[in-house]
Amino acid sequence: MDDIVNSVPSWMFTAIIAVCILFIIGIIFARLYRRASAEQAFVRTGLGGQKVVMSGGAIVMPIFHEIIPINMNTLKLEVSRSTIDSLITKDRMRVDVVVAFFVRVKPSVEGIATAAQTLGQRTLSPEDLRMLVEDKFVDALRATAAQMTMHELQDTRENFVQGVQNTVAEDLSKNGLELESVSLTNFNQTSKEHFNPNNAFDAEGLTKLTQETERRRRERNEVEQDVEVAVREKNRDALSRKLEIEQQEAFMTLEQEQQVKTRTAEQNARIAAFEAERRREAEQTRILAERQIQETEIDREQAVRSRKVEAEREVRIKEIEQQQVTEIANQTKSIAIAAKSEQQSQAEARANLALAEAVSAQQNVETTRQTAEADRAKQVALIAAAQDAETKAVELTVRAKAEKEAAEMQAAAIVELAEATRKKGLAEAEAQRALNDAINVLSDEQTSLKFKLALLQALPAVIEKSVEPMKSIDGIKIIQVDGLNRGGAAGDANTGNVGGGNLAEQALSAALSYRTQAPLIDSLLNEIGVSGGSLAALTSPLTSTTPVEEKAE
């Protein structure tokens, strides 16, 4: 070992010792050197005096030095005053507040030194720092609140905050602190139960609070009532508007339905009128065709009957003439001139009787023809009357429907229906009345025609009944005495005068004078232009070319 030490050069040994000493010194320096940071500074006291270190560092030797760390961060110190500790405002009201103070140590040698001297290590504990400076904050809050009313505090919070900040800033600077900002985080009126009525301030504030709350309650009640009234009025207006809209919708629906019904009724009326016109034309065509057929058939039958009657009459006349010639020849041969004259008179009587029978047959034919013509005229009149009445009824119905539709469109919805029903009934009644009037207008002529046709049809029976007394005559003797005013006196046929005419006519006229109920029968015959007093009067319509005048009604 000694050899090794002796073998090392002295300079090297010296160097090693120096390095060791430097290493030891570095370790000691590292252990004694304290650095400051941006968040924390410190104040060193002791050997060498007070030194504030904000950046960099310093040697702190135990026993010789002591350091006080200072927190350079911004600290939030929250102060709450409520219930019985609440603030009293200028108007003697109590308010609960929560105020946050944001403070920090002044970033200066003086500020840090002052903070270290007055606060020490409390800057590292916000709660300890708050407890230390809280009274300053409370004093500033009370002083500022006493200068403002509760409403001013609420309405101008920035003024309150600024007042607190100005009041407390100077006190904080004495501790090396600076106030960054003040925030009023909570503000509310203190409850009434925390007011002490035995305290003058609280009593005054309680009185004002009671007055204010009651006034506000009344105002709130008035507002609530006004709001309720306004809401009800709004609901009423809304309901009224809703009902009005529903009514308008209902009216529009009814109007639309009415228009649809009106259009439908108009279309149905046009269709009905068109169909009625078609039916009328078809019926008129059919009636015309049937009438032409009936007229043709009647004309044909009348022509056949006329030819037949004419032929029979000619044959009968020839037979009568032949018989007369034969009888005259036989009388000339068998009896004298006087007897021949008597037989001739008898032959003339029989000829006249045969002629009367022929005339009666002709009258029957004429009666049949007139009856057919009357029936045809009746049918034509009835068809024309029916057509006219139907046309008038259709026109009245269509016009009534049009008037009803126009009235329905102009009247109210419910009134329209009732009014339409009433007008429809009136229109139908008017149409029926018009039809009845038309029928009544034609009824007299039709009745008269039917009456005359009935008389014509019953004429044979009337004549038969009128000569009923002739059945009691057993026989008729004709005694002709010339020169006794034969045919000289023209008596009235209705009185039964037998004067004038041949023997047959005189005999028949005399027989007719024995008719029963002659006035009544003559009156009935006069209705159709026939006189029943004599054979000539009965056959005058057949032999006369003068038309029978219509009897004035």
From Swiss-Prot:
Query: According to the UniProt topology, which residue ranges lie Cytoplasmic?
Result: 31-553
The answer, when asked if Nucleotidyltransferase is one of the entry's keywords, is: no
Going by the UniProt record, its keywords in alphabetical order are: Cell inner membrane, Cell membrane, Membrane, Transmembrane, Transmembrane helix
Q: Which residues lie on this side of the membrane: Periplasmic?
A: 1-9
Q: Which InterPro entries does its entry note?
A: Band_7, Band_7/SPFH_dom_sf, Flotillin_C, Flotillin_fam
Report how it sits in the membrane. Answer: Single-pass membrane protein
**Which SUPFAM superfamilies does the record match to this protein?**
Band 7/SPFH domain (SSF117892)
Q: What's any one GO cellular component for it?
A: membrane raft
What residues form the membrane-spanning segments?
Answer: 10-30
Q: How does it assemble?
A: Homooligomerizes.
The family this protein is said to belong to: Belongs to the band 7/mec-2 family. Flotillin subfamily.
Its biological function? Answer: Found in membrane microdomains that may be equivalent to eukaryotic membrane rafts. FMMs are highly dynamic and increase in number as cells age. Flotillins are thought to be important factors in membrane fluidity.
Protein's UniProt name? Flotillin family inner membrane protein YqiK
From the broadest rank down, the organism's phylogenetic lineage runs: Bacteria, Pseudomonadati, Pseudomonadota, Gammaproteobacteria, Enterobacterales
